[in-house]
Amino acid sequence: MKVLKFGAAWCTPCKMLQHIIDGIDSDVPIESVDIDEESERAMQYAVRGVPTLVMLDDTGTEIKRNVGVLTRDKLLEWLK
């Protein structure tokens, strides 16, 4: 399982979410994807807004997603 975190350098909420991610301890790997640098990948996952988190199972199938900033506690719950 892994999480793709779609964001952009100009996105203030993305920076807020990254700060929260940096402050947690999780066994789930979180890969950052810049929508400006990897627009095709963002289109592949139908990202309509940032920040967007997409959780994938081991086969690459989407399990769930979240659009917007989460609190630390909500993020930890979402990662379960």
Q: Residue spans of the language-model regions?
A:
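Structural micro-motif
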Residues: Y45-V54
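Mobile acidic interaction elements
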Residues: T12-P13, D22, S39, Y45, ...
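Local sequence-structure signature of Cys/Sec-based thiol-disulfide redox active-site neighborhoods
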Residues: M1-I24
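Non-catalytic, surface beta->alpha helical segment in thiol-disulfide oxidoreductase systems
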Residues: M55-K80
